[in-house]
């Protein structure tokens, strides 16, 4: 654009010869530029990352299953000749039971096996099995020709009992349980301390408590504490509901209890939680009709497993109930249930803590007075306080708001605590606990 004198203000190249030609970067310059901005250990980190990628690639090649839609290895890794030879050499085995070992101390011991519904045989061991692996009463796998013992088998356990084992840990921790600080401390003394610090009990010469009874009104956090224990401990956790052990046929419930403890003894450390134990643990009586005889047999088997002739081993037992007054005295005695923990109604501090626990996962205002709300919920259980938080969220959704206000909580208190008081069974259960 020209200025006031008419000269053009745009810059022009006066001399094309002064421009230097563009020179391409060589490999040395590129390597130098790559070093800019790198830390001291960048080269070592890069080398380790490359090694990890190579190992992952090698693992995927060896497995050849994860990246395949059919679940098969790549055809390049197939060995059909070896697979065919394996199928011809390995024949299906038959399940039998070793009833007696003859001349066990000799170099060539003999074993009496019982093939179910067929016959009994005196057999030898195959070359793959050591004599120390076979015991009397054990299930074994034998071939169909010479009936030689090829493999020891684990004890037979009902699949219903196996399904009671908790594989995935619950997502509940001790910080998610409010109003039960004293109860959690007592529970951890029984469950965690013997597993983590057994030398303390050995030095004192005492055996740690092995059984705990959790009792209290409904909704006070008994099952919630058991879920927190399952999350905390690394031991095997088995969950049993009392009504699952009530079976139709005679002896089925007692057999399930027996197999349950057999499976627990195979673990290094085990924790069994019986929920609603009053379903099978009621006091024994004779009604004249014999309707509860099977339930009483199941309870007697449970009593025998807890503290009978055979030692229990490293098995901790938790039991929860709303009606401790109905339990049999033989089940309640020390040695079977050493500690009784009462879960009473939470106090003001506990109710405030429970409100904060449930509100921290909600979108709420910052200046909500939780202590005031806790004062408006006297004699309330933790389940009722959780229902208050849920109803407060429902009031906010009904008003098409994204956050819950203190007014929503006040309306929820009026609805849950005051309007639903006629449905509450807490006063009646308080007379039983």
Swiss-Prot record:
Keywords, comma-separated and alphabetical: Acetylation, ATP-binding, Cytoplasm, Nucleotide-binding, Nucleus, Phosphoprotein, Proteasome, Ubl conjugation
Record-given protein name: 26S proteasome regulatory subunit 7
CDD domains per record: RecA-like_PAN_like
Subunit structure: Component of the 19S proteasome regulatory particle complex. The 26S proteasome consists of a 20S core particle (CP) and two 19S regulatory subunits (RP). The regulatory particle is made of a lid composed of 9 subunits, a base containing 6 ATPases including PSMC2 and few additional components. Interacts with NDC80/HEC; this interaction is detected only during M phase. Interacts and SQSTM1. Interacts with PAAF1. Directly interacts with TRIM5.
Residue ranges of the region described as Disordered: 1-22
Keyword Nuclease: no
Residues that coordinate or bind ATP: 216-223
PROSITE patterns for the chain: AAA
One Pfam family of this chain: AAA_lid_3
Phylogenetic lineage: Eukaryota, Metazoa, Chordata, Craniata, Vertebrata
Predominant location: cytoplasm
Ranges of Basic and acidic residues composition bias in the record: 8-22
Stored InterPro entries: 26S_Proteasome_ATPase, AAA+_ATPase, AAA_lid_3, ATPase_AAA_core, ATPase_AAA_CS, NA-bd_OB-fold, P-loop_NTPase, PRS7-like_OB
GO terms under cellular component: nucleus; P-body; proteasome accessory complex; proteasome complex
Recorded GO MF terms: ATP binding; ATP hydrolysis activity; proteasome-activating activity
Gene3D superfamilies with a match to the protein in the record: 1.10.8.60, Nucleic acid-binding proteins, P-loop containing nucleotide triphosphate hydrolases
